[in-house]
């Protein structure tokens, strides 16, 4: 491969060949140059339609932007187009990352995060010597570069971001792909480069270059993309560190190198680790390879050593298509982490990025490479992995074009797509280098690669800057400490005056800052109807009131400082009142919007406003006197009225003035009125704010409803656009049918397919309609509720049965417990005998004998109680002993069960061993029989030969060996017979497959020839159509000229000169005209008759072509 790119550079043309005359400027081979006369557009194939919109005023040049939109915009529209207007292309949704996180000053504009497309670069390798010898020097290549970003293969054009022809060098590829990748990584974006193509197309050479170029001490021109990228990366890191040395900028880089061989991951830096597993990090939602070696790198030499080590361990084999064919996908990954610190606020910035350099194994056909054995197995795994990658790219391109998200994207179908899922449609910028071969033998693989690249161009990634900010804990602690000190200082100076009688400077600065913030933040409220400030209840305990204290001292600085403070304060408040008055007169004030937007003239106010919380206010007589207090005194006393605007105006007229001395009672009354007015204003403001929140909630609900409607309209627009496209294709087919190009059978088949597509679209539109979806959701909810009710009904019956069963059990237990609680018969009899005591009257009659009877009864009760206690103890001990026996029996039963299971398992094992031994015994018996038979045969032969004595023992031993060898040979013969049958079956299957492939190849050749013939016929028909259109235009032009001439003659012949001088008619006779006038009239009518006949013949003759054209239009 090195010889291809190095030896052919001198012989390759310096500039690409000019495009053919039928090729468009930038659209590929299918677009024809539009002429000045009107003709119909030729429709492009679907696979080469650029989904990107035409450039707008916001488009800018980017390395990841496809120029196809601009080239298609430059094509002029046709003069006549009888079809429907074309469907507008789908717009790419670009994520503007640069606005959220600006790039450094030195970063170029091309590497910004505003473009989320995929950069696709096609590189055409020079033809090899073998290809030149086989195809001949004069034979043309299959692929040709027609422009800076377009190629053509067999009349079919493709448009990409860049196209590198045979004369391109490694430096050109680096400038196209490598340099933007380095800038993106330094800006914090993840970046990836894929090298895709068939085997032997130059992917490995483009990515790594030859190993000799890596090991050379001098800089070689054949170095690949990877060493050039890291050389620029380390130089840019040094520049950034020198440029931002004040920010303590530090970079850390570590690299890993792996390969995917037969769907198994191997660490190329440590080849002992094989079959590594891919794990997913739940915290960061990213994937990684477990136990993969990562080496820290600091210079380009470290990276070169890793590349040499990894590429030496990579699996490469020789095939007929390539002497060193890569048999695995390899991925070289570099993790870059930068840390910087902002010295102003102490915050730390951490920016991470990742570079993935992927060299995919080349797709190959067994027919061309003649692979067999391990090579065939490797080729099957490679083609399967690339097929899954192509399927994934098709799905991602479909999602990007349609804008509809899919529930499942098959990232896990292969190790390659699972490992690189972040680069495919995720948080990364992707560039793809598609290497193709110009040989005619590889035209199908080249076309497949170009189609793959064109589909990959439609993918949209969401690349964002990976940056985190962490505030310094020490700086935050210092700020908290300073704020606490300021708060403590404000509290101490706010309650006690200074030693010299002047107010605290820190308190004044803090107060002025808060006043500035409150005046510089206007608050706008919505329009409120029927507003009344008297409906809100105000708690007087939560309102701050000015204290009424006597002033016993004045400022020590005298009246000069007091007057200066007064003037500053009066000027600042006067300016604020002017701003408020202007807001009052404006529309915003009429809408009950309150706002204050002004600034104080002097930030260092030295006169405080005395405010004391009502909850901690004490008696003014008991408090200490304060100096130079200020009070809110109205300059004009407001009148009590219910008008809210009047109260607001009265509150605006309030002024802050200084008071040297005690405040009189009239002023206190005025202050109370002012505060009541302020309370009412605040109550109205609070109520308006609540109403504004309610209105905001309503508007948010309306916005959600409008968003749903917008989504519905978007879906309907897409469906309508698809239906319009189908109708346009139908019109085109009808035109081709009328022109005689398309047969009726093909038209009917195409109509059937289009109607099926339209039916699917309408069905999808119906299913995705919001009302239908809501109805479905409601139906599912009702069905679930009905199912729940049914289950509840079934459960109710079951529960009723269980309740009845439990009632029966309870009744049984109660009856049994009552039976158990009955005393034994002996105790009952004893109790009955005891209970048969004499009555009191009998005891009185008995006298002394009654006392003896009572004593005997008591003794019997005591003995009976003792007997019952003993019986109870015996029953308890008996129950405990029985319980222990039950537990022991349970343990014994469990042990017996375990022993029985073990015995059963042992018996099963013994049976299996017995069966195996029996089989072995049978085989040994058969072998022994064969050996004995052989021995008997040998003995018989020896007896016939007359052998006696010791020779017979030797013969017996030989006979045993011969019989053993016979048995082994019989086994081998049977094994090889089975193997032969299997191989014959495989051979027959392979022959059938080859025959089927041959038939398929013949059919494909026939189809290609038919397609080429149809294409030629279509071109001829289109040329004839253009000629017919030109003839139509010429005839129309001639017809217009003839009509103009006739109109001129009509205008000249309507008023002859001799008609004007006719004599007056007589009174008795009829009016007569001279012969000259009548002759002239008849003359121009006779002259006009042939033109009228010609025009009628033109318009009414069915055999004329113009009549058929009008009929076609109708």
UniProtKB/Swiss-Prot annotation:
Residues 98-107 have a biased composition (Low complexity). Keywords: ATP-binding, Coiled coil, Microtubule, Motor protein, Nucleotide-binding. GO terms for cellular component: cytoplasm; kinesin complex; microtubule. It comes from the Eukaryota. Residues 1-119, 1055-1081 are annotated as: Disordered. GO terms for molecular function: ATP binding; ATP hydrolysis activity; microtubule binding; plus-end-directed microtubule motor activity. Belongs to the TRAFAC class myosin-kinesin ATPase superfamily. Kinesin family. KIN-12 subfamily. This is Kinesin-like protein KIN-12B. It comes from Oryza sativa subsp. japonica (Rice). The lineage of its organism: Eukaryota, Viridiplantae, Streptophyta, Embryophyta, Tracheophyta. The gene is KIN12B.
């Amino acid at each position: 491969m090195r010889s291809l790119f190095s030896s052919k550079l001198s012989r390759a043309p310096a500039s690409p060949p000019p495009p053919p005359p039928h090729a468009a400027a930038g659209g590929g081979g299918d677009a024809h140059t539009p002429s000045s006369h009107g003709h119909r557009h030729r429709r492009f194939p679907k696979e080469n339609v650029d989904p990107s919109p035409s450039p707008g005023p916001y488009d800018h040049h980017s390395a990841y932007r496809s120029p196809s939109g601009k080239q298609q915009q430059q094509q002029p529209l046709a003069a006549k187009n009888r079809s429907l207007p074309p469907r507008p292309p789908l717009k790419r949704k670009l994520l503007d990352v640069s606005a959220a996180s600006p790039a450094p000053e030195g970063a170029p504009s091309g590497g910004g995060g505003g473009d989320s497309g995929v950069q696709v670069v096609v590189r055409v390798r020079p033809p090899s010597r073998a290809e030149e010898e086989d195809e001949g020097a004069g034979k043309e290549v299959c692929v040709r570069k027609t422009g800076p970003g377009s190629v053509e293969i067999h009349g079919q054009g493709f448009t990409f971001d860049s196209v590198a022809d045979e004369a391109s060098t490694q430096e050109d590829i680096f400038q196209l792909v490598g340099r933007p990748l380095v800038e993106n990584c330094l800006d914090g974006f993840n970046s990836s480069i894929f090298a895709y193509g068939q085997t032997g197309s130059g992917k490995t050479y483009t990515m790594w270059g030859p190993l000799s170029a890596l090991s050379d001490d001098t800089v070689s021109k054949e170095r690949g993309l990877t060493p050039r990228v890291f050389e620029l990366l380390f130089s840019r890191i040094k520049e950034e560190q020198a440029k931002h040395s004040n920010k303590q900028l530090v970079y850390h880089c570590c690299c890993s190198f792996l390969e995917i061989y037969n769907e198994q991951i191997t660490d190329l830096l440590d080849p002992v680790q094989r079959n590594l597993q891919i794990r997913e990090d739940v915290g960061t939602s990213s994937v990684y390879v477990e136990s993969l070696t990562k080496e820290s790198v600091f210079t380009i030499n470290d990276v070169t050593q890793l590349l040499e080590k990894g590429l030496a361990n990579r699996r490469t084999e020789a095939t007929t298509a390539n002497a060193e064919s890569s048999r695995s996908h390899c991925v070289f990954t570099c993790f870059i982490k930068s840390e910087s610190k902002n010295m102003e606020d102490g915050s730390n910035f951490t920016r991470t990025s990742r570079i993935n350099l992927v060299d995919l194994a080349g797709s190959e056909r067994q027919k061309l490479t003649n692979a067999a054995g391990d090579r065939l197995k490797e080729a099957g795994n490679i083609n399967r992995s690339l097929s899954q990658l192509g399927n994934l790219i098709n799905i991602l391109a479909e999602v990007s074009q349609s804008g509809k998200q899919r529930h499942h994207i098959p990232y896990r179908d292969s190790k390659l797509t699972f490992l690189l899922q972040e680069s495919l449609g995720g948080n990364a910028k992707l560039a793809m280098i598609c290497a193709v071969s110009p040989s005619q033998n590889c035209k199908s693989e080249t076309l497949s690669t170009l189609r793959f690249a064109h589909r990959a161009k439609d993918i949209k990634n969401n690349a964002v800057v990976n940056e985190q900010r962490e505030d310094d804990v020490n700086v935050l602690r210092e700020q908290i400490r300073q704020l606490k000190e300021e708060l403590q200082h404000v509290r101490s100076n706010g309650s006690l005056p200074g030693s010299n009688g002047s107010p605290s400077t820190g308190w004044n600065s803090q107060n002025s800052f808060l006043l500035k913030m409150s005046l510089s933040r206007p608050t706008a409220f919505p329009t409120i109807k029927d507003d009344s400030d008297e409906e809100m209840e105000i708690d007087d305990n939560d309102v701050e009131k000015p204290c009424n204290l006597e002033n016993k001292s004045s400022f020590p600085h005298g009246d000069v400082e007091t007057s200066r403070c007064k003037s500053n304060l009066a000027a600042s408040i006067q300016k604020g009142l002017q701003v408020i008055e202007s807001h009052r007169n404006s529309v915003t004030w009429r809408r009950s919007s309150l706002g204050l937007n002004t600034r104080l003239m002097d930030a260092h106010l030295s006169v405080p406003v005395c405010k004391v919380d009502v909850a901690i206010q004490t008696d003014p007589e008991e408090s200490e006197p304060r100096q130079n207090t200020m009070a809110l005194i109205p300059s004009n006393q407001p009148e009590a009225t219910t008008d809210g605007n009047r109260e607001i105006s009265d509150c605006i007229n309030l002024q802050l003035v200084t008071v040297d001395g005690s405040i009189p009672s009239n002023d206190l009354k005025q202050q109370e009125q002012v505060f009541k007015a302020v309370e009412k204003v605040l109550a109205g403001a609070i109520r308006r704010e609540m109403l504004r929140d309610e209105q905001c909630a309503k508007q948010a609900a309306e916005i959600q409803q409008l968003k749903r409607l917008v989504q519905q309209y978007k879906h309907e627009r897409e469906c309508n656009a698809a239906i319009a496209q189908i109708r346009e294709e139908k019109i085109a087919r009808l035109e081709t049918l009328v022109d005689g190009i398309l047969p009726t059978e093909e038209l009917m088949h195409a109509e059937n397919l289009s109607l099926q597509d339209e039916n699917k679209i309408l069905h999808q539109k119906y299913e995705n309609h919001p009302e239908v979806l809501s109805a479905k959701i409601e139906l599912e909810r009702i069905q679930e509720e009905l199912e729940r009710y049914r289950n509840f009904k079934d459960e109710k019956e079951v529960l009723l049965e269980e309740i009845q069963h439990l009632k029966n059990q309870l009744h049984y237990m109660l009856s049994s417990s009552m039976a158990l609680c009955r005393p034994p018969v002996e105790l009952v009899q004893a109790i009955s005998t005891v209970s048969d005591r004499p009555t009191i009257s009998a005891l009185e009659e008995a006298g002394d004998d009654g006392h003896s009877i009572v004593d005997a009864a008591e003794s019997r009760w005591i003995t009976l109680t003792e007997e019952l206690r003993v019986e109870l103890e015996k029953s308890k001990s008996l129950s405990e002993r029985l319980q222990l026996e039950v537990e022991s029996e349970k343990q014994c039963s469990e042990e017996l069960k375990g022993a029985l299971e073990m015995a059963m398992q042992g018996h099963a094992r013994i049976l299996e061993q017995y069966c195996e031994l029996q089989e072995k015994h049978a085989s040994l018996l058969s072998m022994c029989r064969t050996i004995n038979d052989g021995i008997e045969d040998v003995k018989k032969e020896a007896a016939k030969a007359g052998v006696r004595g010791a020779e017979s023992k030797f013969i017996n031993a030989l006979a045993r060996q011969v019989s053993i060898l016979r048995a082994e040979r019989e086994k081998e013969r049977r094994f090889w017979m089975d193997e032969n049958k299997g191989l014959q079956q495989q051979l027959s299957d392979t022959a059938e497959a080859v025959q089927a492939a041959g038939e398929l190849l013949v059919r494909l050749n026939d189809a290609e020839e038919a397609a080429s013939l149809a294409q030629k016929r279509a071109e001829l028909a289109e040329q004839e159509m253009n000629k017919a259109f030109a003839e139509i235009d010429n005839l129309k032009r001639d017809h217009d000229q003839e009509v103009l001439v006739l109109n001129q003659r009509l205008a000249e012949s309507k008023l002859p000169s001799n008609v004007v001088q006719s004599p007056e008619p007589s009174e008795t006779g009829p009016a007569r005209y001279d012969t000259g006038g009548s002759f002239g009239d008849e003359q121009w009518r006779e002259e006009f008759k042939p033109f009228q006949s010609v025009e009628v013949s033109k318009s009414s003759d069915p055999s004329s072509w113009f009549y058929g054209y009008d009929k076609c239009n109708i």
